[in-house]
């Protein structure tokens, strides 16, 4: 989704991550059809996950389970991340796939810390909070996620400002709610 939005805005990017099965093939095809660059690692087993959002009063979500990421695949990802250069922007988005450590976002930000790579993190809960010590350039909690972090209800702009400010105090350079 990030690469599609950037492409629509005329910004060149490369979609990077893991794909598997017919869903992974379709993801690659759709991105390339829209002119997006891809550098996915294709896994030999499993199927890329599909997330379904149902428009209803309760906003039901159905999140399928994706493929298991092997240590070998993780090392391949890290090698690709090592190719990033000063001034590049890395977006880490979503939940952690099966097989990766719960600290993977922290590990990646730590690995890139000295290289002046701008990082954007779109994640929830501890996955988001645990990267703050690495001073990501931008984090993007929605107002529900922001409230969950601080165990409060965010129901007006004043609370958004207060609690987004608290995330900045904890290390985020910019917070987009």
What function would you assign to each model-found segment?
Residues 14-16, 39, 91, 120, ...:
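A structural signal for isolated positions on well-ordered beta-strands in alpha/beta enzyme cores
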Residues 106-119, 123-177:
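Conserved phosphate/ATP/ADP-binding segment of small-molecule kinases
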